[in-house]
Amino acid sequence: RELPPWQRPCPIRVVFEPQAHGATSFRFNGPNGEYGQPFDWQMEVYGTPERILDSVLPHEIAHTIFASHFQQRLPRWLDEGACSSVEHVSETRKQEHNLLVFLTTGRGIPFNQMFQMMDYPRDMLPLYSQGYSVVRFLLELDSKPHFVNFVRQGLQTHDWDGAVERYYGFNNLSDLQVTWNKWVGEGSPKLIVANESKSQYVPRLRQQH
């Protein structure tokens, strides 16, 4: 559906520096500040001109799209993971590399905790890498509209176990996490170019539990 118009444009502050990163802030106009139409946008983007254009801006703009579409706060893994998925491959490869480091050094986050996180944890970087990888895995399994419908049900019901069962066929978040771990262990392959179809790939991974 078409996104609602904003009350005012979003001002963007640009700072050129070697490290690519950004920040976008806004408020919701609902009674508790967690729901409603977003407003009072502020965006800051940092990095080289190339990285700002191909990674930082797409990431920060994606935050505004998700806020405008769902009109509520999102779990941190979902918001940052989905927004990281639109970055340049040079940035997403860093996430994939960092993920392996985090998972092999005891910094991975259990899904039953991660899916409920509405605020950033003290150790933020694993959330970004793991969130990106989980979003990419789900997008490999089905279409973007399917993913959006999955998110909508999870937000409405607060039952992510039920949402992941309905939309992706996993028994619960634990089942998803074990299967995702197997996928990561196989190198996070693109399923559209895998030697077996998507319908064969996930059942094979689950049989390895």
Spans of features found by a protein language model:
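Sec-exported extracytoplasmic/periplasmic mature domains
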Residues: 1-2, 62-71, 87-92, 104, ...
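Post-HExxH zinc-binding segment in Zn-dependent metallohydrolases
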Residues: 69, 73-118, 167, 171-183
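Beta/coil-rich, acidic/histidine-enriched accessory regions frequently appended to metallopeptidases
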Residues: 109-112, 122-126, 156-209
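Juxtacatalytic substrate-recognition/specificity segment
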Residues: 1-75, 92, 108, 117, ...
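Stable alpha-helical elements in mature extracytoplasmic
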Residues: 53, 57-61, 78-82, 95, ...
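Short, solvent-exposed loop/turn and secondary-structure capping segments
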Residues: 24-27, 95-98, 150, 193-195
